[in-house]
C-alpha cells in the first residue's frame, strides 16, 4: 500500500474514492456489449429493446461531456459517432430477420397481384406447353386456375370435341344402315336399280362424276359388224355403265340407226350438251343418246317400250315396294292406336273415323305376309277377328 501511495501523482485521491473519480475516458463502453452481444444472443427481440442501453449511454455521455474539457482523443469521438449513427439510422423492421435457412416467409393472406397480367399469361403458356407434352405421352396435365373464370381448359375442350365427333360418326353410320335396310347396297345393285333406298340420294352419289364422251373410241364400227361389237363400242364411247340397255337398243333398232344416233350424240356434246327437264344439270352422254332415241320420229313407240320395258318394270316394282312399306308402317300405328283406345257402345263417330284406315291397314298387312320379300308381322301384333261383323263395329 505504501508503494502504491508513493506511485500516486499529485492531485490523486485515496483508494476509497477511486471508484467515484474515474475519468470518463477510462470507463468501459457498454455500447458494444449491448449492441453486439445482446443483438447476437437475442435475434427475436424488437429493435427498440435492443437500442435501449444505447439511449441511456447517450444521456450519460452528454452530461459528462459538459463537465469535462474538449481534450478527448479523436478515437473516442469516432467511436461515439459510429455507435450513435448505427443506433438511430437503422430503419425499423416489421419482423425480425430469421437466420434459419430452412425457414421461409409465409405468404401474406389476401394479397392481390397488381400489374401481373403478362407474367401470368407467360406462365400459363408455359404450363400449356407442359400439359400438351403430357397429353402426347398419355398423361393428363393440370391447368392453372389462378385466373378463375378466365381460365380455359383446352385439353378438356379437345377431349369433348373428339367424343362429339365420334358420337356423330356413329349416328351417321346407324342412319346409313337404317336407310339401306340394314345392308349396304353394292354399286352393281345401284346401277341395275335393285337397291331400295328410303331416301333419294344426291346426284353425285347416284350418277357419279360426269364423264366426258370419248369421241375417237377404240376402233371404227360399221353396219356390217356384229351387234355385240357395235353395242360394246357405243357403250365405251358414251361412258355408259348400263351396257345391257345399249345392247337392247342395238338389237331392236339395228346397227345403222344406232351408229347414226351415236354421231348425233357426239355433235350435241361438242356443242355443249343437253340439260335435264328442270335444268339443274347437264345430261350424261348416255342420257343424250337415249333422249335422241326417244325423240326420233323413225323409231316407233312399240320399239321404245320394248327397249325400256325392264327399266320401267324395275321402277314400278320399286315404287310398289315403297308404297307397301308406307302402308305397313301406317298399319302398325293404327293397331297401336286401336289397342290404346276404349270405344263406348254408343260412340258411332269414333268407330266410323277409324273404320276405313283399319281396313286399309289390315289389307296391307295381309299383302305383306303374302309377299316373299317383305317382312312378316309377329303373332302378337295381329288383330284378332272372330267374326266378319266385328270390323263393322269400328
Swiss-Prot record:
Molecular function (GO) terms listed? Answer: mRNA cap binding complex binding; RNA binding
GO cellular component terms given for this protein: Cajal body; cytoplasm; nucleus; ribonucleoprotein complex
Which positions does the record annotate as the modified residue N-acetylalanine?
Answer: 2
Give the subcellular location.
Answer: Nucleus, Nucleoplasm; Nucleus, Cajal body; Cytoplasm
Keywords of this entry? Acetylation, Cytoplasm, Nucleus, Phosphoprotein, Protein transport, RNA-binding, Transport
UniProt keyword Transferase present: no
Which residues lie in Basic and acidic residues bias regions? Answer: 178-193, 369-394
Phosphothreonine: modified positions: 296
Q: Where is this region: Disordered?
A: 1-109, 178-208, 365-394
Region listing for Necessary for poly U RNA-binding and snRNA export, in residue ranges: 279-287
The short motif Nuclear export signal is annotated over 130-139
Query: Which Pfam family name is an example for this entry?
Result: PHAX_RNA-bd
Q: Answer whether the UniProt record assigns the keyword Ribosomal protein to this protein.
A: no
- Region labeled Necessary for interaction with CBP80 — which residues? 2-329
Q: Subunit structure, briefly?
A: Found in a U snRNA export complex with PHAX/RNUXA, NCBP1/CBP80, NCBP2/CBP20, RAN, XPO1 and m7G-capped RNA. Part of a precomplex with PHAX/RNUXA, NCBP1/CBP80, NCBP2/CBP20 and m7G-capped RNA. Interacts with NCBP1/CBP80. Found in a complex with snoRNA, Interacts with NCBP2/CBP20. Interacts with DDX39A; this interaction stimulates PHAX RNA binding activity.
Briefly, what is this protein's role?
A phosphoprotein adapter involved in the XPO1-mediated U snRNA export from the nucleus. Bridge components required for U snRNA export, the cap binding complex (CBC)-bound snRNA on the one hand and the GTPase Ran in its active GTP-bound form together with the export receptor XPO1 on the other. Its phosphorylation in the nucleus is required for U snRNA export complex assembly and export, while its dephosphorylation in the cytoplasm causes export complex disassembly. It is recycled back to the nucleus via the importin alpha/beta heterodimeric import receptor.
Q: What is this protein called?
A: Phosphorylated adapter RNA export protein
Q: Which organism is it from?
A: Bos taurus
Question: Corresponding gene?
Answer: PHAX
Amino acid at each position: 500500500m505504501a508503494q502504491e501511495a508513493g506511485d500516486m501523482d499529485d492531485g490523486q485521491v485515496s483508494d476509497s474514492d477511486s471508484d467515484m473519480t474515474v475519468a470518463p475516458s477510462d470507463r468501459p463502453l457498454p455500447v458494444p456489449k449491448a449492441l453486439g452481444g445482446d443483438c447476437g444472443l437475442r435475434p427475436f427481440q424488437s429493435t427498440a429493446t435492443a437500442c435501449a442501453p444505447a439511449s441511456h449511454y447517450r444521456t450519460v455521455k452528454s452530461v459528462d461531456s459538459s463537465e469535462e474539457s474538449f481534450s478527448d482523443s479523436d478515437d473516442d469521438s469516432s467511436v461515439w459517432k459510429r455507435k450513435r449513427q448505427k443506433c438511430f439510422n437503422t430503419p425499423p423492421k416489421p419482423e425480425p430477420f430469421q437466420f434459419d435457412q430452412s425457414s421461409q416467409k409465409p405468404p401474406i393472406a389476401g394479397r392481390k397481384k397488381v400489374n401481373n397480367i403478362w407474367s401470368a399469361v407467360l406462365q400459363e403458356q408455359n404450363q400449356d406447353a407442359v400439359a400438351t407434352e403430357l397429353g402426347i405421352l398419355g398423361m393428363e396435365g393440370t391447368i392453372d386456375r389462378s385466373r378463375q373464370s378466365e381460365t380455359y381448359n383446352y385439353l378438356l375442350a379437345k377431349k369433348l370435341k373428339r367424343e362429339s365427333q365420334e358420337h356423330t360418326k356413329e349416328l351417321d353410320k346407324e342412319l346409313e344402315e337404317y336407310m339401306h335396310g340394314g345392308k349396304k347396297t353394292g354399286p352393281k345393285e345401284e346401277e341395275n336399280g335393285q337397291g331400295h333406298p328410303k331416301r333419294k340420294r344426291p346426284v353425285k352419289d347416284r350418277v357419279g362424276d360426269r364423264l366426258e364422251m370419248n369421241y375417237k373410241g377404240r376402233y371404227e364400227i360399221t353396219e356390217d359388224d356384229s351387234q355385240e361389237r357395235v353395242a360394246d363400242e357405243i357403250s365405251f364411247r358414251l361412258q355408259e355403265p348400263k351396257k345391257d340397255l345399249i345392247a337392247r337398243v342395238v338389237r331392236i333398232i339395228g346397227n345403222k340407226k344406232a351408229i347414226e344416233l351415236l354421231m348425233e350424240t357426239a355433235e350435241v356434246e361438242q356443242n355443249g350438251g343437253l340439260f335435264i327437264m328442270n335444268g339443274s344439270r347437264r345430261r350424261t352422254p348416255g342420257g343424250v343418246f337415249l333422249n335422241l332415241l326417244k325423240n326420233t320420229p323413225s323409231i316407233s313407240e312399240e320399239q321404245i317400250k320394248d327397249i325400256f320395258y325392264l327399266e320401267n318394270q324395275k321402277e314400278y316394282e320399286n315404287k310398289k315396294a315403297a308404297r307397301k312399306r308406307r302402308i305397313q308402317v301406317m298399319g302398325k300405328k293404327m293397331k297401336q292406336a286401336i289397342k290404346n283406345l276404349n270405344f263406348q257402345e254408343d260412340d258411332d263417330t269414333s268407330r266410323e273415323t277409324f273404320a276405313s284406315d283399319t281396313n286399309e291397314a289390315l289389307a296391307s298387312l295381309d299383302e305383306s305376309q303374302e309377299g316373299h320379300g317383305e317382312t312378316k308381322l309377329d303373332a302378337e301384333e295381329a288383330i284378332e277377328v272372330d267374326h266378319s261383323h266385328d270390323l263393322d263395329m269400328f
